[in-house]
């Protein structure tokens, strides 16, 4: 199951970088000029386009691949280097990797923003699933 998910995520990353510069420039120009007619179908296509074109989403996928420990694997301790260019191991819970390529294992302290990939330090909880504050 985990291998299937990994292959799907890697396909998403590969396909998101497959667009040529010309296609990207055309999409940017279209968005700036506002030459669209909107409908429910447009909203869905915009969402799908965003998943494949937006480099922020590609970075999010890479962070997900590098930031979490695998079952029964040794993990990277708090404050130690992490990321897919540094180690094949994820950070120990509740830490996450501060950058997907080369970062440090950190956690979110009390009163700071937390969410989907930014976990609160031990003993704290996030009051939101995607955007919240550590309490």
From Swiss-Prot:
It is found in: Secreted. Expressed in trichomes, that are stiff epidermal hairs located on the surface of petioles and leaves. Disulfide bonds join 75-92, 82-97, 91-105, 107-121, 114-126, 120-134. GO terms for cellular component: extracellular region. GO terms for biological process: defense response. It comes from the Eukaryota. GO terms for molecular function: sodium channel regulator activity; toxin activity. Its main location: secreted. Keywords: Disulfide bond, Ion channel impairing toxin, Knottin, Neurotoxin, Plant defense, Secreted, Signal, Toxin, Voltage-gated sodium channel impairing toxin. The keyword Secreted applies. Residues 19-72 form a propeptide. The keyword Secreted applies. The presence of 'disulfide through disulfide knots' structurally defines this protein as a knottin. This toxin contains 2 'disulfide through disulfide knots'. Belongs to the urticatoxin-2 family. Plant defense neurotoxin that causes pain and systemic symptoms in mammals via modulation of voltage-gated sodium channels (Nav). Potent modulator of human Nav1.5/SCN5A (EC(50)=55 nM), Nav1.6/SCN8A (EC(50)=0.86 nM), and Nav1.7/SCN9A (EC(50)=208 nM), where it shifts the activation threshold to more negative potentials and delays fast inactivation. Also shifts the voltage-dependence of steady-state fast inactivation of Nav1.6/SCN8A, but not that of Nav1.5/SCN5A or Nav1.7/SCN9A. On Nav1.7/SCN9A, principally acts by binding to extracellular loops of domain IV (Nav site 3). This is Beta/delta-urticatoxin-Ui2a.
